[in-house]
């Protein structure tokens, strides 16, 4: 997705669904987690790297998921956090893109639909301004990303992130140039995308948990057996997530 607010909203909602110990494992570097939520989108903003973004989006389950899984299970705090956010980016795209492509055949715009979804979320949260693209921790995160996402390079990622931040912060958001072009039909369609996104939060948490419970140090522990056999309501990490949001960035 070419804009970022929906991915950030989705990722943080998924974190709230994780048990506290798994939440801690995947959120040790929250700036990296936020950057992971942008997925390969920073690479969209240059003709030199858009083909890499397209490949990473299209083939993420076959080409990227093994490296992401390894990072989630054995990587540093930065690698784990970025990988967690990145997986959630792709899961949300898998949820909404098929519907977006169908509407594109009927005349809607992919870009405008995503802007409409972001604007809808801002309106529902009563936010007057769109949050800026986050760049905290970009250097360490770029190195971690390059280590797990071939053929992505750290320099290309940083360059793309700069373009994404510059263009999004200038042109996107309430009252900005790109927002004015959203059509009435696309605003209605954005509500359906929002509903699809909300419905995917719990399944995405389960998908991420399936990867995390295979952490080697926990592989044969009672904790894993509990997670694998648990039924009913899952422990939530809302308080831990609130604490993480107040913590300074990891260095």
State each model region's role.
Residues 1-84, 90-251:
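N-terminal leader/auxiliary helical segments
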């Amino acid at each position: 997705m070419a804009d970022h607010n929906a991915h950030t909203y989705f990722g943080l909602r998924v974190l709230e669904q994780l048990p506290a110990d798994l939440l801690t494992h995947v959120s040790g570097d929250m700036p990296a987690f936020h950057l992971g939520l942008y997925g390969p989108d920073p690479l969209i903003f240059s003709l030199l790297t858009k083909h890499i973004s397209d490949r990473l989006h299209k083939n993420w389950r076959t080409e990227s998921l093994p490296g992401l899984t390894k990072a989630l299970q054995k990587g540093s705090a930065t690698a784990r956090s970025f990988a967690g956010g990145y997986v959630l980016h792709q899961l949300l795209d898998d949820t909404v893109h098929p519907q977006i492509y169908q509407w594109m055949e009927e005349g809607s715009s992919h870009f405008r639909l995503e802007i409409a979804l972001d604007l809808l979320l801002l309106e529902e949260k009563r936010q007057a301004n769109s949050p800026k693209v986050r760049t905290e921790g970009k250097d360490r995160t770029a190195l971690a990303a390059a280590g797990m996402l071939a053929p992505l390079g750290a320099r290309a990622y940083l360059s793309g992130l700069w373009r994404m931040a510059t263009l999004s912060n200038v042109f996107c958001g309430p009252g900005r140039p790109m927002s004015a072009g959203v059509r009435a039909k696309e605003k209605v369609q954005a509500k359906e995308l929002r509903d699809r996104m909300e419905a995917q939060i719990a399944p995405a948490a389960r998908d991420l948990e399936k990867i995390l419970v295979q952490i080697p140090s926990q592989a044969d522990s009672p904790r894993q057996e509990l997670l694998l056999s648990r039924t009913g309501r899952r422990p939530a990490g809302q308080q831990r997530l609130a604490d993480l949001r107040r913590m300074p960035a990891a260095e």
